Swiss-Prot record:
Biochemical pathway: Sulfur metabolism; hydrogen sulfide biosynthesis; sulfite from sulfate: step 1/3
Region G3: start-end pairs: 113-116
Source species: Escherichia fergusonii (strain ATCC 35469 / DSM 13698 / CCUG 18766 / IAM 14443 / JCM 21226 / LMG 7866 / NBRC 102419 / NCTC 12128 / CDC 0568-73)
Family: Belongs to the TRAFAC class translation factor GTPase superfamily. Classic translation factor GTPase family. CysN/NodQ subfamily.
Top-level lineage group: Bacteria
Identification of the protein by name: Sulfate adenylyltransferase subunit 1
Region (G1) location: 34-41
Amino acid sequence: MNTVLAQQIANEGGVEAWMIAQQHKSLLRFLTCGSVDDGKSTLIGRLLHDTRQIYEDQLSSLHNDSKRHGTQGEKLDLALLVDGLQAEREQGITIDVAYRYFSTEKRKFIIADTPGHEQYTRNMATGASTCDLAILLIDARKGVLDQTRRHSFISTLLGIKHLIVAINKMDLVDYSEETFTRIREDYLTFAEQLPGNLDIRFVPLSALEGDNVASQSESMLWYSGPTLLEVLETVEIQRVVDAQPMRFPVQYVNRPNLDFRGYAGTLASGRVQVGQRVKVLPSGVESNVARIVTFDGDREEAFAGEAITLVLTDEIDISRGDLLLAADEVLPAVQSASVAVVWMAEQPLSPGQSYDIKIAGKKTRARVDGIRYQVDINNLTQREVENLSLNGIGLVDLTFDEPLVLDRYQQNPVTGGLIFIDRLSNVTVGAGMVHEPVSQATAAASEFSAFELELNALVRRHFPHWGARDLLGDK
């Protein structure tokens, strides 16, 4: 057993007391990102090593792996603690998103180690979508690079407000304060154009040597700020979803027997209480919450992020993809929206194309009406383009096949975030963040043939009980 873990359990008075104490610690989700070979995996390995989160058998295996795959000579290659795929070890790079878990006396952590190569930007965006904080690594020898800017912009686009700029490999520039200051000023100049009110902090460190990671560096006495671990333990994270109105997307209708009918899902934002009056969208039907069922039994109330099953007092028609919210709240369904897109496919995103989209458990289809602009990563300016290529980031206008209930992504990532799915291959080809729902929109007649429009009108006239929508959007 890990000796530090054993000591913590002893200090708490046993395993049960230790587990209770762990449950009450705050949780911080963060990712490491940046350009290729900036030391992201090594930094995570150093954090795990210096906080004594590595078991003896893992340490022994690391010694052996360092001899076979290591890139640090006689030293331990701490990156191998994270880079688990064979291709990653052979190439000395990170490909997949690797998750690691550790805790200190003050906090619990979930780390997402994301790849730095441009071709794996999609993996980086996936890792960032669930994080509260980003550690952006910069090689002290290279300074701010294009991938540094791209990862910074994607992180802020995905709602991350806390950035730690870790200027790594300071040992290779003789721990130069001048180098640190220059890179800091360069990044701050770039960051002025990033959206939102950001909390940006700078830490000079050496992940390989351990300087300023978990303990103060004796080689950088000119730096009087906190270590990286101290920043992680003390940064105050305010989750947007806690203060937002209630949103409960239905993931699954749970009906194990004739006497029980519940609606399972994760509460996306706000809180819900037994007896609360709720409304189902898009139908608009109202009911009261009779029970809140969890794995640990019934609860009187639940909060954002908790997986629950709601039982209502009335037997009403609710299916996967429907949204429950407070009965007194008005949230109109929309059939169009402007969406910030991170494109992840070789085939460019072009106007006129249609994709399956998935948002908060609901799957439907959307058409690309136009591309307003693409963001130039170098200076964050907007430029007109005909299509959005691989790893491109831009603002796109979408029209949906059916009315959807949406929030802006910055208000609610669950009901404002979507993915694009290729209809033939079923591969995820893009990530979207709702910028602004458009209250009224109509489909373009040119999308449908004359036969399709006539057939649609015929079905709606003679078979209204089928509920077919008007392809032209005339309600």
